[in-house]
């Protein structure tokens, strides 16, 4: 189990709650007459979307890139995180002179609907009751997230996105953008993702959800009202999920069977091994910044994702006659979204007549490779965007 050190400090808990309703980022608010239609049949209104921008939008509004974050990410791509104080989660890719060059592009990232960093979700206050939504919040889907993002892009006055970029759950959003709004996406970079969640991945998510709900402090999702927090359950969920983001080779290289601050086993259930200590740290640090109910909602949204299901089971039909340029990226050691999933996406894109390139990057870093310092990946992303930019006229215009 996660040890006692995983209990969030009052300061972190208070700041996390504050960010849910009043984030330290830009906020687009949508009133009751601007509802967000959800796949479950409910119109969500009012609601808000928290977002960050980097760089400047050019006069022609042709240089906007939307970054879509993964399951446990948020809008703080390339700035210091307001809760943890750590650098943004994709500072390796976004910034001046980087593949998503903020001297050239206008980069946008919003917290997804259902998240816990300022966009409306289960951690937000329900305006009808004045209390936290909790499980009264409607179940959301990846298409719902994208629909909300499209409303934000409308609010920003942008008709067409130069590119939509994201990995994992973010990659699912990228693909959904291309299906739902093909005329609004000039280029797309879906990374380490799939067009539907596999049975294995659904099973991993259910394990995490059950860990959260088995924690007595979850209180049927009413932990905020009752002054508790399911830190143990959420910490275990994070530990289990984090294993799937890595690879056996990466774990062996980093930890092997080395002991943690000792030479001999304690013959107890302390963290004897370095890998145990590492996982406990991952669990304890996660609960300081993330809402447990949001974890339930976002994992469920990923589970429901299946592009082909809305096209009579024919994936290629979803991309038929698309004009979007694609670069699909996978990693050899990613067993959460293996290369076979990316190849299936590429085959469907080819069958639909799309312009698509595909790169499988050799690495032992697992699924999370897209978040790490990986020069080969950076080179591919950079080359793809430069090529697309030339076609769009960005380079020729000196923008």
UniProtKB/Swiss-Prot annotation:
GO molecular function, one term: homoserine O-acetyltransferase activity
Residues that bind substrate: 238, 368
Pfam family, one: Abhydrolase_1
GO CC terms in record: cytoplasm
PANTHER family, alphabetized: HOMOSERINE O-ACETYLTRANSFERASE (PTHR32268:SF11)
Function: Transfers an acetyl group from acetyl-CoA to L-homoserine, forming acetyl-L-homoserine.
EC number(s) on file: 2.3.1.31
Pathway listed: Amino-acid biosynthesis; L-methionine biosynthesis via de novo pathway; O-acetyl-L-homoserine from L-homoserine: step 1/1
Subcellular location: Cytoplasm
Protein name, entry field: Homoserine O-acetyltransferase
Quaternary structure annotation from Swiss-Prot or TrEMBL: Homodimer.
Similarity comment text for this entry: Belongs to the AB hydrolase superfamily. MetX family.
Residues the record marks as active site: 168, 334, 367
The protein's enzyme class: transferase
Catalytic activity field: L-homoserine + acetyl-CoA = O-acetyl-L-homoserine + CoA
SUPFAM superfamilies on file: alpha/beta-Hydrolases
Annotated AB hydrolase-1 domain residues: 63-372
Gene of this entry: metXA
Keywords tagged on the record: Acyltransferase, Amino-acid biosynthesis, Cytoplasm, Methionine biosynthesis, Transferase
């Amino acid at each position: 189990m996660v040890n006692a050190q995983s209990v969030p400090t009052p300061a972190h808990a208070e700041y996390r709650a504050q960010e849910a309703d009043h984030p330290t980022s830009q906020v687009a608010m949508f009133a009751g007459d601007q509802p967000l239609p959800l796949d479950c049949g409910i119109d969500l209104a009012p609601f808000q979307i928290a977002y960050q921008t980097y760089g400047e939008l050019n006069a022609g509004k042709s240089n906007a890139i939307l970054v879509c974050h993964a399951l446990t990410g948020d809008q703080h791509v390339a700035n210091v995180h307001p809760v943890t104080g750590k650098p943004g989660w994709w500072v390796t890719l976004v910034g001046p002179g980087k593949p998503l060059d903020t001297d050239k592009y206008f980069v946008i990232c919003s917290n997804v609907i259902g998240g816990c960093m300022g966009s409306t979700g289960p951690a937000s206050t329900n305006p009808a009751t004045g209390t936290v939504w909790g499980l009264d919040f409607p179940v959301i889907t990846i298409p719902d997230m994208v629909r909300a993002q499209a409303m934000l892009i409308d609010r920003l006055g942008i008709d067409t996105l130069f590119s939509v970029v994201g990995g994992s759950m973010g990659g699912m959003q990228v693909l959904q953008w291309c299906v739902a709004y093909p005329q609004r996406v000039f280029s797309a970079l879906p990374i380490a993702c799939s067009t539907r969640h596999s049975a294995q991945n659904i099973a991993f998510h259910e394990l995490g959800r059950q860990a959260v709900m088995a924690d007595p402090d979850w209180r049927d999702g009413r932990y905020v009202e009752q002054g508790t927090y399911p830190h143990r359950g959420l910490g275990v969920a994070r530990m289990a999920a984090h294993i799937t983001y890595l690879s056996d080779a990466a774990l062996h290289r980093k930890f092997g069977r080395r002991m943690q601050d000792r030479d001999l086993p304690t013959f107890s259930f302390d963290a004897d091994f370095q890998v145990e200590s590492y996982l406990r740290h991952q669990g304890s640090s996660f609960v300081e910044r993330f809402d447990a109910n949001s974890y339930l909602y976002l994992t469920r949204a990923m589970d429901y994702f299946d592009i082909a299901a809305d096209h009579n089971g024919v994936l290629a039909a979803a991309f038929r006659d698309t004009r979007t340029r694609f670069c699909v990226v996978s990693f050899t050691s990613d067993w959460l979204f293996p290369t076979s999933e990316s190849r299936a996406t590429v085959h469907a894109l080819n069958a639909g007549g799309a312009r698509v390139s595909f790169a499988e990057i050799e690495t032992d870093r697992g699924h999370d490779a897209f978040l790490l310092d990986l020069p080969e990946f950076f080179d591919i992303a950079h080359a793809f965007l430069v090529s697309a930019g030339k076609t769009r006229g960005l380079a020729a215009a000196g923008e």
